[in-house]
Every structure is written in structure tokens, then in C-alpha cells.
Amino acid sequence: MSRKNKALLEIAKDIGGDEAVEIVKALEKKGEATDEELAEITGIRVNTVRKILYALYDEKLADFKRIKDEETGWYYYYWHLETKRLPEIIRARKLRELERLKKMLQEETSEVYYHCGNPEHPKLTFDEAFEYGFTCPICGEILQEYDNSAVIEELKKRIEELEIELGLRPSPKKEKKKTRAKAKRKTRKK
């Protein structure tokens, strides 16, 4: 499976789950098809196929041409994948993810959280914990200050990875190579 194909299927899965993946695969194989044909090929209900096709269209991953049947007067929509802009779409999605992660990091670093210790229960901000008298609103246990340093480190790591992928930050490996090259040049000049 090509990298482009894998990225397309990942985006399809984000958009509409396994059903969207099946529709994209069917469109790749067939090239162009109506929603009814795709429903027949995949075994997915026509309404669901249409919903997914419109979601793919909204993401600019699918397009259609409308053809009128002269006998019936009905319009048929022939759908096809539109992957020319896939790199641009992937970049835009990564930028949105980066902004979301930065917002989460801001929230994690600007708040003090409290938690009862049960992983299924929510962590609460100081104000929320104060409101509940520092007892868990679900189980009644005493709330303790929540150590979110691991969460913060994971967010920082993921942000750095995305920034490197997007070319917004130089790769640490590239930095080392540049430094070594500069050191060699300085040594040669002496």
C-alpha cells in the first residue's frame, strides 16, 4: 500500500469509520460510481454512503459529476476520488491537530487539577474541586492534586513531532549535522 493510499484511508477512517474506508476502497477500484453502485458493492445502506460521500466532498477528497437521464429527467451523480490535493489536506489536518494540542498544553500548564484516583472519573480544576468541597462528585472520595507532568511531557513531545513534520521546527538530527559541518569548517580555516 502506498503512503498516499494509506494517508487517504486514515483520513477516510477519521471521517466515517470503517464504512468510509470501504467506500474509498470501492471508489479506488471502480474509478467512478454512483451512490447506489457503491452501496451495492460495499453492502452499506445508500443513505450512509451518501452521508460519507458528502463528508469526503466537504474535505475535498471526493467530487462528482451530475448527469441528467433524458428519458426519466432524473439526475445521476457519478462520484470519484480527488487526491491531487491530498498533501495539502494532510498538512491542513496536521496544522489543526497542532493547534488542538497547543490548546490542550496551555490548559494543562495553566490549571491545577484534582482527582480521586479512579481513572474513569474526571479530573477537576481547582475551582470545580472547591465547588465540590474537594470530594469526588461521583464516588465521594477525597480529591488529591493531580500530577499531570506526564501528560504535559507527552503533549510537548507530540507538538515537537508535528512541528518537525510540518517543517515549522528543524529536526534535532539536522541541527547536529549542521553543527558538525560548522565545526569542520572552523577547523579547516585554522
Swiss-Prot record:
Residues 4-87 form the HTH TFE/IIEalpha-type domain. InterPro entries: TF_E_archaea, TFE, TFIIE/TFIIEa_HTH, TFIIE_asu, TFIIEa/SarR/Rpc3_HTH_dom, WH-like_DNA-bd_sf, WH_DNA-bd_sf. GO terms for biological process: regulation of DNA-templated transcription; transcription initiation at RNA polymerase II promoter. Residues 174-190 have a biased composition (Basic residues). Keywords: DNA-binding, Transcription, Transcription regulation. The keyword Secreted does not apply. NCBIfam families: PRK06266.1, transcription factor E. The winged helix domain is involved in binding to DNA in the preinitiation complex. Monomer. Interaction with RNA polymerase subunits RpoF and RpoE is necessary for Tfe stimulatory transcription activity. Able to interact with Tbp and RNA polymerase in the absence of DNA promoter. Interacts both with the preinitiation and elongation complexes. Belongs to the TFE family. This is Transcription factor E. It comes from Pyrococcus abyssi (strain GE5 / Orsay). The gene is tfe.
